Amino acid sequence: ETLTITILNRKGLEAAHFFCGCDMFRSLQKFSGEIINADGQSVRKIKKSELQKSEYSSSLSTDDYFYFYECNYPSLPFTVKYEWEVKCNNGLIGYPPFIPLADFNQGVEKATYRIELPAGQGCRYRELNTQGKGIQVKESTGANGQQVIKATASKLSPIIKEPFGPDFTELFPRVYFAPSAFKYDKSEGDMSNW
């Protein structure tokens, strides 16, 4: 995955932080980051060894943990770019969702999501809150018969949080993806429909 975000003022600093949740089924394999100043010059490279790991959980027993990096570059505006790879172990019941707007008061210039599956493996998806928001999902077939799904969003205006207003789930556009046939831990099944 790749995330590039430009921070324009102090209110947006939290959006520059990196977070990746892991557990016995998901692990962070690769990571790199880069901070770019207002002049477009790379001022800092971030390595996986600089990530902090936390195993804090409100549950009594869990194997969940997460990696995070707090990006606190002092000069605004700046851009931060993260690239990472997550490995799924013991099967998969869902792919990461496409959520181009991550928080209130953030706009999106361009967001893309692409999933490519080998021939014979199906993927289903469900769009929520995408009507009239400039989000498109297109399916195609690759040269070797693979299923390709691409979701795009461009020029999304920020959603302003209103006191006592609707929740994130009612406002923000997103697309969920899941394999039609799955294997998870020691279970197998078919979820061809929702």
Report residues per predicted region.
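Secretory-pathway-linked proteins and extracytosolic
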Residues: 87-97, 101-194
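Lumenal/extracellular ectodomains and adaptor appendage modules
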Residues: 1-114, 150, 181-185, 193
